[in-house]
C-alpha cells in the first residue's frame, strides 16, 4: 500500500466493529439513542465506501484496487491483505446499503436494543471483510465471524421456534465451514511454500485429484450458504423465525456470500476442476429453480414461501457460472445483485405486514389490501420484480443467464435443450405462486381480515422510505442495466475467459473415437456433456 493512500477498506471493516464495542458504554435504556447511533455508523460506512470507490476505483481495470497488505501473524503466514475488483465492489455496496436500511427497519426493536445493534454492526464488518480480503485464511475468519451474530439474532429476537431455527442454521453452516477450512489448508500447504494468498494459490500447479477434492469442499461449504439443494433446509426455518431486518440481511447479503465464494475460489482458483464440475452445477441449479418453485406452492407461511422463492432464484447463479460464457457470468452476478434488492424488499414488507396483523399465515391475512393500500402497492412491485416482469432487474438478470446458457459451445445441443426447458418450467411457475400469494394475502375473503389491524394503519413514512430505497435500484437496473453491469463487465469476461482457456486441455483428454461408453466411464467428470468446441 502506498504510504499516502488512505486505508479505505481497513477503515470500512474496522469502523463498524469498533463502533459495536462502544455501544455498551452509551447510556440509553430505551434504545432511542442506540437507533440513531447504529443508523449513523452504518450510513457513515456506506458513504465512506461510496466515496472510496468513486474517487479511487477505475472501472477500466480488472486487477485488484485499493489494495492493502500487511504482515499480521507471520508465524501462521497470515497477512492482512485487502483489495476489491469488479466482482467484490458492487457486492460490498449491496451489503452496506441493505444493512443501513435494515437498521431503519429495526427501528421498533425494544428487546435488548444494544445487543441487537452491536450484532448488526459486527455482521456488517464481517460481510465487507468476506468480499474484500485477499488472504484465504483471513477469508475463512471473516466467514466465521458472521455465524455467531446470525445465530444470536435469530435465537433471541425470532419467533416461537427461534431456537430450533437458529440451531439448525449454526449446525448447517458450521458443517459447511469444516469443508471450507479443509480445502483451504489443503491448497495452502501443497508444495514447499505455505501461503494463504489467493492470487499465489491461483498460480500453483495442483494435481488434478487435489484440485477436485478442494473444489468439492468449497462447493459444499458455499452450497450451504447459497443454498444448494439438498443443503437448503435451514433457510425456510431461519427466515420464518427471524425478524424482518435479519431476514433482509440474510436474504439480501448472506446468500450472496455463497455465490461470491463459488466464483472467487472455485472458478478463479480452480478452473480445471470447475470445467469438470460445471455440468453438475447446471443440474443443481435447475433442481434449485424447479424445486424451489414447486415447494413454494405448498407454503402457507408468507416468509417460508419467500424463502422457497429465494432458493429457486439463486439457482440461476449456478446456471450462469457454469455456462462458460461471458453473458452467463454477467447474468449470474447481476442475479446476485438483483435478488439482493428484491428479496430484501419482500422480506421487509412481509415484516411491515406482520407488525399490523401479528401473523404470517397467508389465509389469516386475507383481505388486507383495502386497509393497507400503500403496503399492497409496494409489495406488488417487489413481487413483479421477483417474477421477472420486463422493466425490472429480475427480468434482465434471468434473461441474461438464459442467453448465456443457450449460446454456450461447451455443452451438447441436447443437454442445453433439456436444461433450458426445465429452467423455463421454473420461470413459468414463479408468477403462479407469487400472484397467488398476493391474491391470498391482500385480497381473498374480506371478512377474514385480521381484527387486530386498525383501519388506515398503513405503512409509515419511515417504512415507505426503506421500501422505495430498495425498489429504486430494482427499477433503475431493469430500465438501464449498465448502471450495474458496467462495474463488473470486464471482470466477468476475464473470469469466463480463464475458465474457457482450461477447457481445451480437458477436451483433449476425451476419447476421440466417439465411444460414448468410454466417455461415460469417467462419471466423476461427466465429459459426455462437454463438447470440445473451444
UniProtKB/Swiss-Prot annotation:
Reaction catalysed by this enzyme: a plastoquinone + NADH + (n+1) H(+)(in) = a plastoquinol + NAD(+) + n H(+)(out); a plastoquinone + NADPH + (n+1) H(+)(in) = a plastoquinol + NADP(+) + n H(+)(out)
EC number: 7.1.1.-
GO CC aspect terms: plasma membrane-derived thylakoid membrane
Alphabetical list of HAMAP family matching this protein: NDH1_NuoM (MF_00491)
Organism: Picosynechococcus sp. (strain ATCC 27264 / PCC 7002 / PR-6) (Agmenellum quadruplicatum)
Protein name: NAD(P)H-quinone oxidoreductase chain 4 1
GO biological process: ATP synthesis coupled electron transport; electron transport coupled proton transport
Keyword NAD attached: yes
Family, similarity comment: Belongs to the complex I subunit 4 family.
PANTHER family: NAD(P)H-QUINONE OXIDOREDUCTASE CHAIN 4, CHLOROPLASTIC (PTHR43507:SF21), NADH-UBIQUINONE OXIDOREDUCTASE CHAIN 4 (PTHR43507)
Broadest EC class assigned to this enzyme: translocase
Swiss-Prot/TrEMBL keywords: Membrane, NAD, NADP, Plastoquinone, Quinone, Thylakoid, Translocase, Transmembrane, Transmembrane helix
Single annotated GO MF: NADH dehydrogenase (ubiquinone) activity
Membrane protein topology class: Multi-pass membrane protein
Transmembrane segments: 6-26, 34-54, 87-107, 113-133, 136-156, 169-189, 209-229, 243-263, 277-297, 311-331, 332-352, 376-396, 418-438, 464-484
Chief localisation class: membrane
Compartments in which it is found: Cellular thylakoid membrane
Role: NDH-1 shuttles electrons from NAD(P)H, via FMN and iron-sulfur (Fe-S) centers, to quinones in the respiratory chain. The immediate electron acceptor for the enzyme in this species is believed to be plastoquinone. Couples the redox reaction to proton translocation (for every two electrons transferred, four hydrogen ions are translocated across the cytoplasmic membrane), and thus conserves the redox energy in a proton gradient.
Lineage: Bacteria, Bacillati, Cyanobacteriota, Cyanophyceae, Oscillatoriophycideae
Amino acid at each position: 500500500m502506498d504510504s499516502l493512500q488512505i486505508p479505505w477498506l481497513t477503515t470500512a471493516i474496522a469502523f463498524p466493529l469498533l463502533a459495536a464495542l462502544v455501544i455498551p458504554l452509551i447510556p440509553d435504556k430505551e434504545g432511542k439513542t442506540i437507533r440513531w447511533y447504529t443508523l449513523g455508523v452504518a450510513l457513515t460506512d456506506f458513504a465512506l465506501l461510496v466515496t472510496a470507490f468513486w474517487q479511487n476505483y477505475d472501472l477500466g481495470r480488472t486487477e485488484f484496487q485499493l489494495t492493502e497488505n500487511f504482515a499480521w501473524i507471520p508465524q501462521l503466514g497470515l497477512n492482512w491483505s485487502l483489495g476489491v475488483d469488479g466482482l467484490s465492489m458492487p457486492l460490498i455496496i449491496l451489503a452496506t446499503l441493505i444493512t443501513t436500511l435494515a437498521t431503519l427497519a429495526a427501528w421498533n426493536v425494544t428487546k435488548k436494543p444494544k445487543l441487537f445493534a452491536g450484532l448488526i454492526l459486527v455482521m456488517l464488518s464481517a460481510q465487507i471483510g468476506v468480499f474484500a480480503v485477499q488472504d484465504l485464511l483471513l477469508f475463512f475468519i471473516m466467514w466465521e465471524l458472521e455465524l455467531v451474530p446470525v445465530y444470536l439474532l435469530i435465537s433471541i429476537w425470532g419467533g416461537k421456534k427461534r431456537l430450533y431455527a437458529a440451531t439448525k442454521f449454526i449446525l448447517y453452516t458450521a458443517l459447511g465451514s469444516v469443508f471450507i477450512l479443509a480445502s483451504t489448508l489443503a491448497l495452502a500447504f501443497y508444495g514447499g511454500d505455505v501461503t494463504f494468498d489467493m492470487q499465489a494459490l491461483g498460480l500453483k500447479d495442483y494435481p488434478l485429484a487435489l484440485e477436485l477434492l478442494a473444489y468439492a469442499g468449497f462447493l459444499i461449504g458455499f452450497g450451504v450458504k447459497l443454498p444448494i439443494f439438498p443443503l437448503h433446509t435451514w433457510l425456510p426455518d431461519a427466515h420464518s423465525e427471524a425478524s424482518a431486518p435479519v431476514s433482509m440481511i440474510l436474504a439480501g447479503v448472506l446468500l450472496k456470500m455463497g455465490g461470491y465464494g463459488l466464483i472467487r475460489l472455485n472458478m478463479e482458483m480452480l478452473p480445471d476442476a470447475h470445467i469438470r464440475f460445471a455440468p453438475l452445477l447446471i443440474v443443481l441449479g435447475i433442481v434449485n429453480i424447479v424445486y424451489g418453485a414447486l415447494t413454494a406452492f405448498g407454503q402457507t407461511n408468507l416468509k417460508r414461501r419467500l424463502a422457497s422463492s429465494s432458493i429457486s432464484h439463486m439457482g440461476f447463479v449456478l446456471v450462469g457460472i457454469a455456462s462458460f460464457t461471458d453473458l452467463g457470468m454477467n447474468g449470474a452476478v447481476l442475479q446476485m445483485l438483483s435478488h439482493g434488492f428484491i428479496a430484501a424488499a419482500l422480506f421487509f414488507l412481509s415484516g411491515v405486514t406482520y407488525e399490523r396483523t401479528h401473523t404470517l399465515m397467508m389465509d389469516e391475512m386475507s383481505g388486507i389490501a383495502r386497509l393497507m393500500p400503500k403496503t399492497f402497492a409496494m409489495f406488488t412491485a417487489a413481487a413483479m420484480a421477483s417474477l421477472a416482469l420486463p422493466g425490472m432487474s429480475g427480468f434482465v438478470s434471468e434473461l441474461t443467464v438464459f442467453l448465456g446458457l443457450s449460446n454456450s459451445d461447451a455443452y451438447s445441443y441436447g443437454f442445453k435443450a433439456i436444461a433450458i426447458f426445465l429452467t423455463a418450467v421454473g420461470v413459468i411457475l414463479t408468477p403462479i405462486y407469487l400472484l397467488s400469494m398476493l391474491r391470498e394475502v391482500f385480497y381473498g375473503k374480506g371478512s377474514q381480515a385480521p381484527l387486530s389491524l386498525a383501519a388506515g394503519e398503513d405503512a409509515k413514512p419511515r417504512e415507505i422510505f426503506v421500501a422505495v430505497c430498495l425498489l429504486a435500484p430494482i427499477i433503475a437496473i431493469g430500465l438501464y442495466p449498465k448502471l450495474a453491469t458496467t462495474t463488473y463487465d470486464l471482470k466477468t469476461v476475464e473470469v469466463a475467459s480463464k475458465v474457457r482457456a482450461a477447457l481445451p486441455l480437458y477436451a483433449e483428454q476425451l476419447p476421440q473415437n466417439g465411444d460414448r461408453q468410454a466417455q461415460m466411464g469417467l462419471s466423476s467428470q461427466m465429459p459426455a456433456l462437454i463438447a470440445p468446441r473451444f
